[in-house]
Regions:
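Active-site neighborhoods and metal-handling regions in enzymes and metal-associated proteins
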Residues: 5-185
Length: 185
């Protein structure tokens, strides 16, 4: 089943890194289950052609971490899977580069939306002009969550990107996850 395929490796790596326990129960989703946000069943059989999504975290020194990654169970992407993976990887890289002290905390989100929208258009999933895709948020059919969240004493520290209609600026030592995704069932 999904959970047993990755959970023991996740726990092993957490302990090797100095953590004694997870910050939440890992999500391990194969195939179409990976398109369900916060999927909790974790009990389906994974097929050789499936992608597997692992969303896991651990606590270290009272701080909770979180990371999501997707990989082919066979070890090799199909051509279609690779094309989508590369768009998500580019969104990850560009969004990470957008985290600069003094810049808006909205920059990584906006960057991920732009990169993913262009990628979905290039791959033929969206046909509209890029400006329309972004303005109408048409990408939300495939990318329906935020780029990430703050890391802190809770898994999802309650820290918005804006305050009183003003965008919050990055400060030194602020930490957030960067977890873009494209979900195609």
């Amino acid at each position: 089943p999904e959970y047993s395929s990755a959970a023991s490796d996740v726990y092993k790596r957490q302990r090797e890194g100095g953590s004694n326990f997870p910050s939440y129960t890992p999500i391990v989703a194969g195939g179409s289950n990976a398109c369900i946000l916060h999927y909790i069943e974790n009990n389906k059989t994974i097929k050789e052609s499936d992608l597997v999504l692992v969303d896991a975290g651990c606590e270290y020194d009272y701080y909770a971490s979180d990371i999501t990654r997707t990989f082919p169970i066979s070890g090799k992407f199909s051509a279609e899977q690779k094309a989508i993976y590369e768009v998500v990887l580019e969104a990850h890289k560009k969004s990470t580069e957008a985290i600069i002290v003094g810049n808006s905390c909205m920059n990584p989100q906006k960057t991920s939306e732009e990169v993913i929208s262009q990628g979905l258009k290039d791959l033929g999933f969206l046909k509209e002009p890029l400006e329309e895709i972004l303005e109408k948020k048409l990408f939300r059919e495939f990318y329906y969550h935020k780029i990430g969240h703050w890391i802190g004493l809770d898994v999802h520290d309650d820290s918005p990107y804006t305050y009183k209609d003003e965008e919050i600026k990055f400060k030194e030592n602020m930490i957030m996850t960067i977890e873009p995704g494209i979900y195609i069932n």
